[in-house]
From Swiss-Prot:
Gene behind the chain: rnhC
Biological classification of the source: Bacteria, Bacillati, Bacillota, Bacilli, Bacillales
Record protein name field: Ribonuclease HIII
Cofactor: Mn(2+); Mg(2+)
Matches recorded under InterPro entries: RNase_HII/HIII, RNase_HII/HIII_dom, RNase_HIII, RNase_HIII_N, RNaseH-like_sf, RNaseH_sf, TBP_dom_sf
Subcellular location: Cytoplasm
Amino acid sequence: MSNSIVIQTNSTVIEDMKQQYKHSLSPKTPQGGIFMAKVPSCTITAYKSGKVMFQGGRAEAEAARWQTVSQTPKTAVKKSVDSHRYAPPASIGTMSIVGSDEVGTGDFFGPMTVVAVYVDAKQIPLLKELGVKDSKNLNDEQITAIAKQLLHVVPYSSLVLHNEKYNELFDKGNNQGKLKALLHNKAITNLLTKIAPTKPEGVLIDQFTQPDTYYKYLAKQKQVQRENVYFATKGESVHLAVAAASILARYSFVKQFNELSKKAGMPLPKGAGKQVDIAAAKLIQKLGKERLPEFVKLHFANTEKAFRLLK
């Protein structure tokens, strides 16, 4: 169900909005309307009455951008995880950018994979033709087919944090959020070096934490990308660079996962449900508990549940 938010503002702000969204204006304007604009995952409609309606998955984020400049803040907009100074510009969907995403963070078995992809604006129609979209709406076979083509089309940087290293870093006090931040930053830095002297118009990270927290996680890193970096939840729907990164990250994860299943000598389930507890218990019986760190993320509750099944 799409969100719908209305704010009350004034003619000056509405004129600023029209200017901001000038590349996204719709030829159609509803009765009593001043303009209608369509940006990724949000439609903005401004009315002569001073009301502005935001509709779509990113309605809260877009509304929050203008709520701060509106002179009538009494129509409060609910605080959104997308409400921050790192929100992408309205025109980002048509820009040449780097997008990054991660896969495997919610799976007990298997590694964490992070990929950064550079998509030139001219490549956007081709990516659409290849079927690039939110990887959650694609099965493993579709992911593989699209990924194999993407590998030859877009520059990318792919990182894999294997389970043993993941557990070692986690034991040293690095939570999953910090590990994700480190990998995203590394993948982005690697890719920017790879595509130099080409400079993207921006970097869009599929948001997994507040941007200020992300940069706190990177405080001790020598190289941190800060220039024109944007964060957005559901980044796949904001720019195809994130959708492409998501597909390549999942492709890498599936390949690693299959190798892990071969190593285990048994099929390993994805996710973190009950079937995972049962498989982990079988794996402990088969290979011994000392081998478990090679296959799983030990801090998940599934570890304790698996051992409980063996009692």
